[in-house]
């Protein structure tokens, strides 16, 4: 067997790797001291081999009702992204965070000094892979070799990560060819539990929750993740590379890396528009990306459901690619009623984490009660306990996930892997706003749209560790994923609007407004096509369908196609209540002054002043 120093190479030819990758692998093998090295090739044979090993070990079990679907339960302490332990590391603190006043904790960006990082890494990574295999995963974000694509190499000691990365990114030999001796994003991941293990491993899921650390070094294009196997912390191509590191690269190179879905919407007359939309986690990005239109003649096709990399083309239009290869979706609430296309996507070749399992070998989670054939079937919940519908507690963890290949989505767009991307006509921001915010409004300009995105708020969700129903700020839906100083990020958006460029129109939507009895005012889901229809008509210049308000243009009464809808309280749904917005404006000013302070671009401050003035003048 070939060796690298003392370490046997179980698979792959080390000497065929690009020289920079060889140095990276050798250096980290010396640091983490695995018992062997395994260079992944992304083949089906490799996946089958790893799946068999994990089934034998008890970490995965097949869901017998489907073809090649597997379920896995994690340690109950390792179930979500850990924002409090996720850091950006820059020599100057203010490259990462804004200049906030004394006593105000920045909510965007979480800074650590390079010296502190060195200490933290030194206390974790030496010898951390003892007794485990180090897998080397070459992966491409975006089509291999595409002009907008980026290559990463992830080292990990988790086979769950190897299996998930081949669904979520493009893994394979061709990545090495595309890389050559160019630079790549260095991704180092360990579950942080060297063998012999001194503590009890729960659910055959090694992790080290007390010692979790996720650190990004943007200047070095490097990511370190320790102690967690959960996807949001361990699949380093996802939020870490595709948003936190990519937003830094994008700032340097003049493009955008955003937390947005990309959808193609075709009108009944055959004209297609592409829309990117930013919603905080668990506000329905995946549902909108795979919308099943309730209006006849409309067609929606999905390019991506979570991340958009966008760059202006030679023709002045903004082109977007989905850098991912799969969907990593929240399972609870996903059903044939709420998202039939997602359900169709994960009928095979998918991995389910922390969901329930029925005695018939099917998955189960909250939201599937009406769709399950046998309501009395015995189940095992996400904690591995016996469970039945009607029992107390939840069957699936609220942040349980499916990982499914995007190519299996029945409405995946034929251009979803186009290397140059699709041209974006509109950007939508949205969040869960129970009060005060109309169903949809169009912003006044690119700058007013940036201001509106900076003010994005939403009720907190399961994807992060926050609890309770508080409405939280989530600017541009990027709060947990900001890769650098948010004031500089806003300035970057402003600077992108150069002469000769056609910037998209920017909209804000709110599917979640409630009436006095706490009932939703809007039916949502497939009916959201009616809002998209209004947006598209605005894009196409249809006259007389909008009304000016202090916050932007809302649909004129009767402008939204209501055929076949039950009674909707249109006035309440579209209203812009003066008292609400007067208070909101004060709250937004306080937020931007405290959180962005002197880093707030003057153009955005001017937008804030102008909007306050419009609200105060409102009758």
Swiss-Prot record:
Q: Which cofactor does it need?
A: Mn(2+)
Q: Which Gene3D superfamilies does the entry link to?
A: 3.90.228.20, Phosphoenolpyruvate Carboxykinase, domain 1, Phosphoenolpyruvate Carboxykinase, domain 2
According to its UniProt record, what is one Pfam family this protein matches? Answer: PEPCK_GTP
So where does substrate get bound? 81, 230-232, 281, 399-401
* PROSITE patterns per the UniProt record, alphabetical: PEPCK_GTP
Q: Which SUPFAM superfamilies match?
A: PEP carboxykinase N-terminal domain, PEP carboxykinase-like
Residues involved in GTP binding: 282-287, 401, 432, 525-528
Q: Name one GO biological process term.
A: glycerol biosynthetic process from pyruvate
Q: List the catalytic residues.
A: 283
Q: Which reaction does it catalyse?
A: oxaloacetate + GTP = phosphoenolpyruvate + GDP + CO2
A GO term from the CC aspect: cytosol
Keywords of the record, alphabetical order, are: Decarboxylase, GTP-binding, Lyase, Manganese, Metal-binding, Nucleotide-binding
What superkingdom does the record give?
Eukaryota
Q: Name one GO molecular function term.
A: GTP binding
Question: Where on this chain does Mn(2+) bind?
Answer: 239, 259, 306
The cofactor binding remark recorded in the entry reads: Binds 1 Mn(2+) ion per subunit.
Q: What is its EC number?
A: 4.1.1.32
Q: Per its UniProt record, what HAMAP family does this chain match?
A: PEPCK_GTP
Quaternary data: Monomer.
Of which family is this protein a member?
Belongs to the phosphoenolpyruvate carboxykinase [GTP] family.
What is the recorded function of this protein according to its Swiss-Prot or TrEMBL entry?
In parasitic nematodes PEPCK carboxylates phosphoenolpyruvate to oxaloacetate thus introducing the products of glycolysis to mitochondrial metabolism. Catalyzes the conversion of oxaloacetate (OAA) to phosphoenolpyruvate (PEP), the rate-limiting step in the metabolic pathway that produces glucose from lactate and other precursors derived from the citric acid cycle.
The name on file for this protein is Phosphoenolpyruvate carboxykinase [GTP]
Organism of origin is Haemonchus contortus (Barber pole worm)
């Amino acid at each position: 067997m070939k060796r690298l120093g003392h370490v046997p190479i179980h698979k792959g030819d080390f000497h065929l790797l690009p020289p920079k990758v060889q140095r990276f692998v050798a250096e980290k093998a010396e640091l983490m001291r695995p018992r062997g090295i395994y260079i992944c090739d992304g083949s089906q044979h490799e996946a089958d081999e790893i799946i068999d090993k994990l089934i034998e070990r008890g970490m995965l079990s097949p869901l017998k009702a489907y073809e090649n679907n597997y379920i896995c339960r994690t340690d109950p302490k390792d179930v979500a992204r850990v924002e409090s332990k996720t850091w950006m590391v820059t020599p100057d603190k203010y490259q990462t965070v804004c200049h906030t006043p004394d006593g105000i904790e920045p909510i965007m960006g979480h800074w650590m000094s390079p010296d502190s990082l060195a200490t933290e890494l030194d206390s974790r990574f030496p010898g951390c892979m003892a007794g485990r295999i180090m897998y080397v995963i070459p992966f491409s974000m975006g089509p291999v070799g595409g002009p907008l694509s980026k290559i990463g190499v992830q080292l990990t000691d988790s086979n769950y990560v190897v299996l998930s990365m081949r669904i979520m990114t493009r893994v394979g030999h061709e990545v090495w060819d595309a890389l050559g001796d160019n630079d790549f994003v260095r991704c180092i991941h360990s579950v942080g539990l060297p063998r012999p293990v001194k503590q009890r491993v729960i659910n055959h899921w090694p992790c080290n929750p007390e010692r979790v650390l996720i650190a990004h070094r943007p200047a070095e294009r490097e990511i370190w993740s320790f102690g967690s196997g959960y996807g949001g912390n361990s699949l380093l191509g996802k939020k870490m590379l595709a948003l936190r590191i990519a937003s830094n690269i994008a700032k340097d190179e003049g493009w955008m890396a955003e937390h947005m879905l990309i959808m193609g919407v075709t009108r009944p007359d055959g004209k297609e528009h592409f829309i990117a939309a930013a919603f905080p986690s668990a506000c329905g990005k995946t549902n909108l990306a795979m919308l099943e239109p309730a209006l006849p003649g409309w067609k929606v096709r999905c390019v991506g459901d979570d991340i958009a990399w966008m760059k202006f083309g030679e023709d002045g239009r903004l082109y977007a690619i989905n850098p991912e290869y799969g969907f990593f979706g929240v399972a609870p609430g996903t059903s044939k009623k709420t998202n039939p296309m997602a359900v169709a996507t994960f009928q095979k070749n998918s991995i389910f984490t922390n969901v329930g399992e029925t005695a018939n070998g099917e998955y189960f989670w909250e939201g599937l009660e009406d769709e399950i054939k046998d309501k009395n079937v015995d189940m095992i919940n996400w904690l591995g306990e016996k469970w039945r519908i009607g029992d107390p507690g939840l069957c699936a963890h609220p942040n349980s996930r499916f990982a499914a290949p995007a190519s299996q989505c029945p409405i995946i767009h034929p251009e979803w892997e186009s290397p140059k991307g699709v041209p974006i006509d509109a950007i939508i921001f949205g969040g869960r706003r129970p009060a005060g915010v109309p169903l949809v409004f169009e912003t006044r300009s690119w700058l007013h749209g940036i201001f509106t995105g900076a003010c994005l708020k939403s009720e907190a969700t399961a994807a992060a560790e926050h609890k309770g129903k508080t409405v939280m700020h989530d600017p541009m839906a990027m709060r947990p994923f900001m890769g650098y100083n948010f004031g500089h990020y806003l300035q970057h958006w402003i600077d992108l609007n150069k002469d000769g460029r056609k910037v998209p129109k920017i909209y804000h939507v709110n599917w979640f407004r409630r009436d006095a009895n706490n009932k939703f005012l809007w039916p949502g889901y497939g009916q959201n096509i009616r809002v998209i229809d209004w947006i598209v008509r605005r894009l196409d210049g249809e006259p007389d369908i909008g009304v000016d308000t202090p916050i932007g243009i809302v649909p004129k009464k009767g402008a939204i196609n209501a055929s076949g809808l039950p009674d909707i309280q249109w006035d309440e749904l579209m209203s812009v209540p003066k008292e609400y917005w007067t208070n909101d404006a004060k709250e937004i000013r306080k937020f931007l002054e405290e959180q962005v302070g002197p880093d707030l671009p003057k153009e955005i401050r001017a937008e804030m002043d102008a909007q306050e003035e419009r609200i105060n003048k409102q009758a």
